[in-house]
Amino acid sequence: ARRRRSRRASRPVRRRRPRRVSRRRRARRRR
């Protein structure tokens, strides 16, 4: 599953997990 992030690999960014996030916002960020 890490290979799927190869597209974002060009941008070094740490995986951030917000403490409280609405399920609707999560579905919107899941592109």
From Swiss-Prot:
The keyword Cytoplasm does not apply. The keyword Nucleus applies. Signal peptide: none annotated. Residues 1-31 are annotated as: Disordered. GO terms for molecular function: DNA binding. It comes from the Eukaryota. GO terms for biological process: cell differentiation; chromosome condensation; spermatogenesis. GO terms for cellular component: nucleosome; nucleus. Testis. It is found in: Nucleus; Chromosome. Keywords: Chromosome, Developmental protein, Differentiation, DNA condensation, DNA-binding, Nucleosome core, Nucleus, Spermatogenesis. Protamines substitute for histones in the chromatin of sperm during the haploid phase of spermatogenesis. They compact sperm DNA into a highly condensed, stable and inactive complex. Clupeine Z is probably the result of a crossover between the genes for clupeines YI and YII. This is Protamine-Z. The lineage of its organism: Eukaryota, Metazoa, Chordata, Craniata, Vertebrata.
